[in-house]
Amino acid sequence: MNIQDMILTLQKHWSNEGCVLMQSYDVEKGAGTMSPYTFLRSIGPEPWRVAYVEPSRRPADGRYGENPNRLYQHHQFQVIIKPSPDNIQELYLDSLRALGIDPLEHDIRFVEDNWENPSLGCAGLGWEVWLDGMEITQFTYFQQVGGIECKPVSVEITYGIERLASYIQDKENVFDLEWTSGFTVKDLFMMAEYEHSVYTFETSDVDMLFHLFSTYEKEAIRQMDNGLVHPAYDYVLKCSHTFNLLDAKGAISVTERTGYIGRVRNLARKVAKTYYEEREKLGFPMLKEEGSSHE
């Protein structure tokens, strides 16, 4: 099964479970969790079901396209369900069956791996899912997002698309993976992998990036003061990505690193608080929609 068919299969499976199929969010981010479809929608009491593919940029993992398992940008298939259903593990195993992986014929283990994202003030209880000894999915029950306690708890399922495809296609080099008929990962992404690695490690302007971080930080605060959650959060994401570029370049010392992470976290917490307050002013409208849909 090629990657395109994998994505279509997962989309169909989770759509059948009531998930909204969203498109990837158009601001750079290091993980699918950072999308507003997860970060913001996990806050507050309103129900939410979503599934989407998220390109995830990790500048420090760039290897000029020369490493068979490390990528500047990889892809995640992200599922969020709030509140978490009691049968979520079985729904997940059903998704593996849809991909042609029979749990009865493979060693599938849920290995405890509690998760946190310090820069966003997020934490949860969770597991890595191992398929015949290889991690393919992260399974997390959110306890806190943006410093706000999650009530009710959301469950997040994050499939590593290239990792899972490597298993399904039995390929050792990620660039040899078939994306769709006639196109490999190498065909689609090798040039970008090389160029982003050159930029990250060689040609990026450190002074400019420091300036951008401060500019984005100020604009995030200014838009929160205006009560504009989504524009503010876009600038939080830009701060995070800019920090990752500086960190990958080695421009931030160990002692400075903690301070920069704290600055991003403070912004994320303010956005989370503002989002909750704005939804509360609206009377948490999706609660009413959920109630009416069951009448």
Curated annotation (Swiss-Prot):
Pfam families for this protein: tRNA-synt_2e
**Keyword Metal-binding, does the record have it?**
no
Please state the Enzyme Commission number of this protein.
6.1.1.14
Task: List the HAMAP family hit by this protein, alphabetically.
Answer: Gly_tRNA_synth_alpha (MF_00254)
Query: Which keywords fit this entry according to its UniProt record?
Result: Aminoacyl-tRNA synthetase, ATP-binding, Cytoplasm, Ligase, Nucleotide-binding, Protein biosynthesis
At the top of the EC hierarchy, this enzyme's class is: ligase
Subunit structure of this entry? Tetramer of two alpha and two beta subunits.
As for family, the record states: Belongs to the class-II aminoacyl-tRNA synthetase family.
Annotated GO biological processes are:
glycyl-tRNA aminoacylation
**GO cellular component: a single term:** cytosol
Q: What is its main location?
A: cytoplasm
Q: Kindly give the PROSITE patterns that the UniProt entry links to this protein.
A: AA_TRNA_LIGASE_II_GLYAB
The cellular location(s) given in this protein's UniProt record come to: Cytoplasm
Q: Which InterPro entries match?
A: aa-tRNA-synth_II/BPL/LPL (IPR045864), Gly-tRNA-synth_heterodimer (IPR006194), Gly-tRNA_ligase_asu (IPR002310)
* Name listed for the protein in its UniProt record: Glycine--tRNA ligase alpha subunit
> Which reactions does this protein catalyse?
tRNA(Gly) + glycine + ATP = glycyl-tRNA(Gly) + AMP + diphosphate
**Per its record, what are the GO molecular function terms?**
ATP binding; catalytic activity, acting on a protein; glycine-tRNA ligase activity; transferase activity
